[in-house]
Amino acid sequence: MEERQDQKVIRINLLQVSMTLGTYLGIYITLVYLVTAMTVKYANLTLIAIPMILGIPVVAYMLIRHFRDENCKPFFPFPVSWIITILTFLFATALSCMVAYLYLRFIDHGAFAAGLMEHLEIMIQTFQAEAQTFTDPAQLEQYDKAMELMRQSVTWFCSLPASGVTKQLIQSSLMWGNILSLIIALITAKKLRIK
């Protein structure tokens, strides 16, 4: 009976730790989403947004490593590390995607999509001026196909309602969270050293 209670306490602690770490990571990812959304209006913010996006795995690693070091145990097995990491990404995804949905639904009112379409048109005009220098018809045809595919993709993305964009964010966040959780768990796991 005691063993079951101890296991239950451990599971609750894992969930509590994952929720806490997921909240911190979710706040960081929310800031990344907001800075990325602002890059449509202020292009110079791209210099901040790209390092912030690349910093998501680093922040997740630092959070898990901090928990591992504060745990004060010499043994932090891979399964425990992986469960904490994957649950951290799950809770971070829930928080950040909820905030992204609220932003897109009630604050943005289509400004993000309009900004994307405006940037797409500027890019296409710039590339068309460059394409006039092409002499190879095959290269020109390949360029036209690529531009049309880009236009269709951006138009499709901009036509999504806030719930559709949020579903895309959830899917991509969970996919990348699963991949990153395996890598981070491998790095943060500690084996028991037998002396």
Where does each model-flagged region fall?
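Transmembrane alpha-helical insertion/packing segments
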Residues: 1-72
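Alpha-helical transmembrane segments of multipass membrane proteins
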Residues: 24-32, 55-56, 92-100, 176, ...
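Short helix-terminus and kink motifs of transmembrane alpha helices
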Residues: 61, 65, 101, 105, ...
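Juxtamembrane interface at the cytosolic side of transmembrane helices
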Residues: 69, 180-195
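Alpha-helical transmembrane segments with an aromatic anchor "belt"
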Residues: 69-90
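Functional transmembrane-helix hotspots
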Residues: 99-137
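Individual transmembrane alpha-helix segments
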Residues: 143-176
